[in-house]
Every structure is written in C-alpha cells, then in structure tokens.
Amino acid sequence: MMPPAVFYIIWDAWFTKINVWSFNPAYTVGISLFGLPLEEVLFFFAVPYCCLFIYECIRVYFPALKTTVVSETILFSIGIAVLIMAVIFYDKKYSFCTGLFLAVFIFFLYYLKKKLQFFHSAAFLVSYGIILLPFMAVNGVLTALPVVIYNNAENISCRIFSIPVEDIFYGMLLVLMNVVLYERRPVIK
C-alpha cells in the first residue's frame, strides 16, 4: 500500500498547490501534511485497505469467477477510453493526468501480462463495481458540502451528481495499483 499512497500523496499535493482542487478548512481537523489535510493523507491508506478486503472477498467467495477475454477486453477498453480522454482534454490537468496515468498503468499490465499472471481482471472489475456504490455516496457528500472543491477549468466539467467524472478513474487507478501490489505478495501455505 505504501508505493501507491506515496504516488497519490505527491499527486494530490501537487494538484492542491497548483489549484486543480482545494480543501475547505471548515470541514477538516486543521492538521496539514505536505500541504494536504491529515484526512486526505490517511484516505490513501484506509480506503485501499477496505477496497482490498472487497477484492479478496470476491476472489474467495466466487472462485468460479475467472479472468476471461471479456474481462481483459473491458479493462483494456477502459485504458483506451481514458487515453482518448487525456488526448482530447490535454489542457485540463485533472482529466489529462488521470486519463494518462490510468491508461499507462493498464497498458503496463498488458505489456507484462506473462509476468503478471497473478492479476485477476474479472475480480478487479467486479470488486470495483461494488466499490463504486459507497464511493459515489461518500464522494457525493464530500463534493456537495463542499469538503473538496474542484477547479472546473482543470476537468471536463462532466459530473455525476456533484462528482467530477474523472474521480471514477482516479479511484480506479488507486485501487488497481493496490490490487496489483497485493497480488504480488508471497503465498503462505
């Protein structure tokens, strides 16, 4: 969990510094690390841990769920779609970086497919679909209050309720990075 958390904290701190988004101090405890509210830093550890639990439950309780050409095609298609988003919206930092980072990571998985045989794309897609339900509820509250304030000049201004559509892919990359690192763990027998 540490490498993705460090990556995201750096990304988040940079975007906060250049005003891609900001945090409303009325809703934070007032402790700041790396220019981010403490709650935001802790998010990058707590949320992936919960998401890995959901992913592992899918793996354990649904052993018949296997990676197929369909699940791999869906994930690869997401990579193509977000890369297209990055190219079209190259002048919008949130859209561009989120699309580019997720596309590169997905294509990296496919490039190293033989070495990353442990990755289970079907379980990832099902678990991420489940994760999106609480994500939409909590993120909807955070963006509606607003705890997190987005600079619309840096995203495509397409929202699901009050949530920028890029947040879905931002979260997907966070979960995907953690799942890949988790699956590389040694198996204890």
Outline where the language-model segments fall:
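Hydrophobic, membrane-inserted alpha-helices
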Residues: 76-86, 103-108
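A generic, lipid-embedded transmembrane alpha helix
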Residues: 2-18
